[in-house]
Each structure stands twice: as structure tokens, then as C-alpha cells.
């Protein structure tokens, strides 16, 4: 997953985590903070990290640690989280926090009681390059469901039609 924008409550992390669960892997990683800009603060780093881990990310790859920020590198994909950053001397505190979250996030096995159909083939069928109203409406509905479930603290997985075809219901 790439988290290279400051948007909140996007479904990308949940899609990645759901995919990892479906495929039986215990790692869902996100490259994060590239393009956030030089005004990225430790508090924003923690908030974005928490938001991603709540949605199932369990390994974070911070972007980036530039050896040099000479020339275009300073503005290519800021910030550098390395020694050029004023918060560098505190980075170990953040890294230890992420390390602990990652350990806990991978130590267990996900138990989700809710599945949300992710209509991938429907999206493909409705795609019209010049008229994206149907897809925009579908995106808004999925984001609304996602936000409601996360706000209610209900864990869930997105399942596409292929994943649904191999599911079974147990105990009700």
C-alpha cells in the first residue's frame, strides 16, 4: 500500500489488509509519508500510523531517508525523515512505537465477523471514461459503509466475488 497523501479514512488500507487475510498472509505493509511535505509533525505521523494499524496494516515502511536533499531531492517527495529533519533525534521513539504495533499486529490471527462485498467486477462493468458518476456514487457508498463500521469499532474484511464464492457461514 502507498499512503502518500494526507486524506483521512480512505479504504486502501482495509483493502490491503483484507487481501492479506484472504490470501492467508500475516503481513500487510504500507509505505507512508512520502509527499506529506516538510511540515509533517511527529503527532501527524502517530495519527496516520494509528489510523492505518486500526485498519489492518501491520508493517510500516517510512518514506524516506534521503542521504542528501541537494537539488531536486529536497522537493521530489518530501520529507526526508533522516538527519535533515528537525525531528530526527526523536525518530527512535516513533520507530519503537511502530515496532511494538507491528509485533502485536502480526502475533495474532484476524477474527472478523463482518464481510463487505467489494464490487470489483461491477466497477469494471460500470466504468465509463467520460462519465464516472456511477463509480463516484459507488465509491461514496463504500466509504460510507467503511466509515460507519470503523466508527462502530467493528472489524470487517472486504471480499470480492471470487473470495465470496469460496466462503461459508458458520454458527449463524
Give the residues covered by each predicted segment.
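Carbohydrate-binding surfaces of carbohydrate-active enzymes
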Residues: 1-172
Amino acid at each position: 500500500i502507498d499512503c502518500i497523501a494526507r486524506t483521512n479514512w480512505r479504504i486502501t488500507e482495509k483493502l490491503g489488509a483484507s487481501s492479506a487475510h484472504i490470501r492467508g498472509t500475516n503481513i500487510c505493509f504500507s509505505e507512508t509519508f512520502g509527499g506529506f511535505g516538510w511540515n509533517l509533525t511527529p503527532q501527524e505521523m502517530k495519527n496516520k500510523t494509528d489510523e492505518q494499524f486500526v485498519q489492518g496494516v501491520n508493517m510500516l515502511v517510512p518514506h524516506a531517508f534521503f542521504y542528501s536533499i541537494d537539488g531536486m531531492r529536497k522537493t521530489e517527495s518530501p520529507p526526508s525523515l533522516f538527519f535533515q529533519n528537525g525531528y530526527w533525534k526523536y525518530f527512535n521513539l516513533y520507530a519503537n512505537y511502530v515496532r511494538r504495533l507491528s509485533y502485536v499486529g502480526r502475533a495474532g490471527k484476524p477474527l472478523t465477523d463482518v464481510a463487505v462485498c467489494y464490487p470489483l467486477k461491477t466497477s469494471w462493468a460500470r466504468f465509463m471514461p467520460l462519465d464516472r458518476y456511477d463509480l463516484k456514487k459507488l465509491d461514496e457508498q463504500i466509504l460510507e459503509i467503511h466509515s460507519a463500521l470503523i466508527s462502530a469499532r467493528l472489524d470487517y474484511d472486504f471480499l470480492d466475488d471470487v473470495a465470496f464464492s469460496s466462503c461459508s457461514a458458520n454458527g449463524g
